[in-house]
Amino acid sequence: MEKYIVFVLSYILGSIPFSLVITKIKGINLREVGSGNIGATNVARTGSKCIAALALLLDSLKGFIAVYIAKQFFDDGSFHMYASAILVVLGHMFPVWLKFSGGKGVATTLGILIALNISLVLAFVFVWLAVFFAFRYSSLASLTSTIAAVLSSFFFQRDLFFTLLTVAILIFFKHYRNIVNLLQGRERKFS
């Protein structure tokens, strides 16, 4: 029974739309800014780096907390612990409160990586920063850093590989429009 409670809690925790809440407090309707997405990247487009940093922190924190809670109930490397990691990302991407229209899961994935393996965090963050500063596309940085985390897991924590591969497929699915825009040269750069 407790595994189901942890699974539901992971999804619910992931579905808390922190970015939407904190921008609404500032009088901004995030759904009407930039891409309309509720992730930290779109919060950055509101012009407030502090609010964007807070959104990134909170979205990452929910991924970390979900895995931390799962670790209290399940063995490291267990199916149930990894299922909780996937469910928190699914909650962020498809929150029931927002008609299943949420963020893209990158910050939440960072949080689960922090809870699971610091080596993967280093690969993820290094690649994200390198690609972002080289090309100024947040979406490209997110996609390549996700691939880097999956590939790194194969070498540093193989039991995590299929979990991260699943999360990567979800992230690529949520970035579909960004991928099309990148291929067509229409993706918005950060200046």
Curated annotation (Swiss-Prot):
InterPro entries: G3P_acylTferase_PlsY (IPR003811). Its main location: membrane. Catalyzes the transfer of an acyl group from acyl-phosphate (acyl-PO(4)) to glycerol-3-phosphate (G3P) to form lysophosphatidic acid (LPA). This enzyme utilizes acyl-phosphate as fatty acyl donor, but not acyl-CoA or acyl-ACP. NCBIfam families: glycerol-3-phosphate 1-O-acyltransferase PlsY (TIGR00023). GO terms for biological process: phospholipid biosynthetic process. One of its GO terms (cellular component) is plasma membrane. Coiled coil: none annotated. It catalyses: an acyl phosphate + sn-glycerol 3-phosphate = a 1-acyl-sn-glycero-3-phosphate + phosphate. This is Glycerol-3-phosphate acyltransferase. It is an enzyme of class 2 (transferase). Pathway: Lipid metabolism; phospholipid metabolism. It comes from Wolbachia sp. subsp. Brugia malayi (strain TRS). It comes from the Bacteria. The chain crosses the membrane at residues 5-25, 50-70, 78-98, 112-132, 153-173. GO terms for molecular function: acyl-phosphate glycerol-3-phosphate acyltransferase activity. Probably interacts with PlsX. Belongs to the PlsY family.
